[in-house]
Amino acid sequence: MTKLMNRDEFRAALENAIKGKSANKAPFSVAWATGRLSRAHLARWAENHYHYVGPFADYLGYLYARTPAHMVEAKDFLLANMYEEEIGGDRHTDLLIRFAEACGTTKERVIDPDNMSPTTRGLQAWCYSVAMREDPVVAVAGLVVGLESQVPSSYRKQTPTV
């Protein structure tokens, strides 16, 4: 039987698995980082990103409810992440709305679920599905390591051009 990895080994293996697949290398991210996007592009991005980021605490809440009670550290991690998403400092959705408005769109367009693109709707559905159906370890790997952990490095590359 294969030996289970400890937490640090598992995290390193996950990070190695996504190397070379970073959101930083996506054409949109590259265009943003090099200053080739218009305010209209950024407004549309914010209108869509809101619908992925907005329910992130909900995804984590579903996952928290399904995480076995004996996984206390994992449950604490999920609670801390939910707190940070919703209460700890500026709410991410509020920041997105302000950014979107600065780019020329309205709060009404940002929060309107009928305004999100089919791709964003698919990403949101995938996030809910993973949170509700996958093993908690798989769900954390996909949602937190695979998606959420890429956002800060993307923003570091994009912020100077804004």
Which residues does each PLM region occupy?
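Acidic, low-complexity proline/glycine-rich segments
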Residues: T2-S29
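A short small-residue
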Residues: F28-A33, C127-S129
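Alpha-helical bundle segments that constitute or directly flank the non-heme di-iron/ferroxidase center
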Residues: A17-A23, W32, R36-A69, E84-R91, ...
